[in-house]
C-alpha cells in the first residue's frame, strides 16, 4: 500500500506537473530545442500511461513492481539519461513513420464508422422513444375512456334511480296517483257529481205525494236507475233512459 502511494505521488508530480511547467516555459520562450524535447517526452509518456493502466490490472502483484515504475519515470525525466528522447528516437519514431498511412486510414475509417454508428443509435433511440410515447398515450387514453365509461354507467344506473325513488317517496300526492289502478282517474270527477245527486233525498211515488203534496210548479223527484249516473270511459259517455217526471196531471191520469 505504501509503495502504491509513493509511486502514484511520483508519477503525478514528476511525471505530469514538472514536465507541464517546462513545456509552458518552452512555448513562452519559443525555444525550439526545448519544445522538441518536451514534445518527445509527452509522446513517450502517453504510451507509458497506456502500458501502466494495463500493467496495474495484470502484473501489480509482481515484486518491486511499484519501485520499478518509480525508477522508470525518473529515468525518462533525467537530463543525464534523457530516456524519453532515447525511446522516441530508437523505437517510436521509426515505428510511427512506417505505419503512418495505415494509422491515418484507420483514424478516418473510425471517424466515419463512429459517425454512422452514432446516427444509427440516434435513430433507434428516437424510434424507441416515439414508440414508448405512443404506447403511453394509447394506454392513458384507454384508462381515461374506461374511467369516463364507468362514470357514465354510474350516472345512468345509480343516480336517476335514487332520485326517482326519493322524489316518489317524498311526494305523497304523486305516490297516491301512481298507486291507483289504471283508469281510476277517469272516474274521479263522476264521484263528485254522484255525491251531489246522492245527497238529495230520493222518494218513491207514494212518498212524494204524501210528504210534499202536489204542486203545479214543482215536479216530484223519483228514484232514478243506476244507468242515470254517467259512466265515463275515456271520451265516451253512456247515459240511461230518462223517466218522465210526475206532476199533478200525470198523477191524476195514473189514478184514473
From Swiss-Prot:
Keyword annotations of the record: Cell cycle, Cell division, Endoplasmic reticulum, Membrane, Microtubule, Mitosis, Transmembrane, Transmembrane helix
Regions annotated as coiled coil: none
Membrane topology: Multi-pass membrane protein
Chief localisation class: endoplasmic reticulum
Domain of life: Eukaryota
InterPro entries registered for this protein in UniProt: TB2_DP1_HVA22
Region Disordered, annotated ranges: 177-256
Single GO cellular component term: endoplasmic reticulum membrane
Gene Ontology biological process terms, A to Z: cell division; endoplasmic reticulum tubular network organization; mitotic nuclear membrane reassembly; nuclear envelope organization
Transmembrane segments: 1-21, 42-62, 68-88
Subcellular location: Endoplasmic reticulum membrane
Gene Ontology MF terms in the entry: microtubule binding
The keyword Transmembrane appears for this protein: yes
Biased amino acid composition, Polar residues: 247-256
UniProt family annotation: Belongs to the DP1 family.
Role summary: Microtubule-binding protein required to ensure proper cell division and nuclear envelope reassembly by sequestering the endoplasmic reticulum away from chromosomes during mitosis. Probably acts by clearing the endoplasmic reticulum membrane from metaphase chromosomes.
Protein name, UniProt field: Receptor expression-enhancing protein 3
Organism whose genome encodes this protein: Danio rerio
Gene field: reep3
